[in-house]
Amino acid sequence: AGTSPNNVTPGFYYWDGAKWVRLQTGAGTNNSWLTTGNTGTNASTNFLGTIDNIDLVFKRNNTQSGLLNEFRTSFGYNSLNPASTGVGLVAMGVSSLSANTTGSYLTAIGNDALNKNTTGSQNTAIGTAAMFNNTIGEYNFALGNDALKQNTSGSFNVGIGVAALTSNTLGNRNIAIGNDALKSSTNKSYNIGIGESALKNNTVGEYNIAVGSNSMENNSGSRNNVLGTFSLRNNTSGSDNTAIGYEVLYSNTTGYSNFAGGYHSLFSNTIGGGNIGIGYEALTLNTTGNSNVALGYESLKNNTTAYSNIGIGFQTLFSTTTGGGNIALGAEALKTNTVGRDNIALGLNTLTKNINGNYNFAAGFNALLNNTASNNIAIGYVSQTANTAGYSNISLGFQTLMANTTGYNNTSIGYQSLLNNTTG
């Protein structure tokens, strides 16, 4: 109002007890917040909120879309059930925590995160539909779209990555890190899958550890330990296997209790069990052979069905396919053996060219190097090194029976004993 009786600004007025005050209808200088925006605000004094202990609620189409409460915070259409009594709640995203009743200490960030949660507590879900169906599960952590999406009552799970542990419903204490890790597991527990598609199709296996992309991707076995990309990728029900390296035990399906370490070691093994392959392509072609030990570069590389062989050293028993019960210790010992069985070769190049000879014993550099026959014993430097078809010979000592080729039933003991015997 002006100073004269008729000097009045048009508008609506109210009596504040001392004077008439005009109601502001547009941008003005009072403390009203305008729906068209405000000017002249001061961040240190102006705010949108309350100055008493009353909640601040945001709504859209009369549906709660935000809440500032002493124990609960939410923002997003239909986020956080208004009837929720839980404490320590954070819901950010459309329909996040929309069904929660008494669940407490929950963090849901992303559309539909923890959407069905009712009484479950101590869960963290970050990502669209992360832990969407969880109702009573507790102490879970999900990071990534659809991570732990189907979980209902499973607890103490960690799912990090798109669709990590997405099918889990009842399983407990699983860890999945990587897109699609442990994707198909529903009710199994104590599995660890780290890497994209690690343990992806596991449904019944438990107590497995898979580290590496696609490691144990098709597994349903239990108590397997894998470190390496594509290792044990096709394992179905095989259990108690350990695979370390790229594509180790790649083809294994039902084989059990195998230990393989090194590029492509036991690569082709399918149902063979109780094998140990350590080294580059050790036992790489083994399919059904059991109880073999290969330690060294390409040791027992071509073994397929043979069993109970031991090869230690560079290319030991390299060519063996079906021969079993052999022991080779030393570089290229029994290298070309294929079907020969129950041979023992100790030393560099011992019995290297043996193919089908059986029951031979060679100890010493180049001992029985060229042998293909059976039932020979050669101990000493180049002992019986030229022998090819001779059988049932015994030689003990330096260069004993060194030149023998086809001679048989000989016994040679001592330095260069029967050195030049060839066919006798």
What are these regions (language model features)?
Residues 2, 44-424:
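Glycine- and small/polar-enriched repetitive beta-structure motifs of secreted/surface proteins
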Residues 2-26, 54-63:
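Short, surface-exposed terminal/edge motifs of secreted or surface/virion proteins that either
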Residues 18-21, 26, 39, 196, ...:
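A generic structural signal for solvent-exposed, polar alpha-helical segments
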Residues 25-57:
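Surface-exposed, low-helix, low-complexity loop/repeat segments of extracellular attachment proteins
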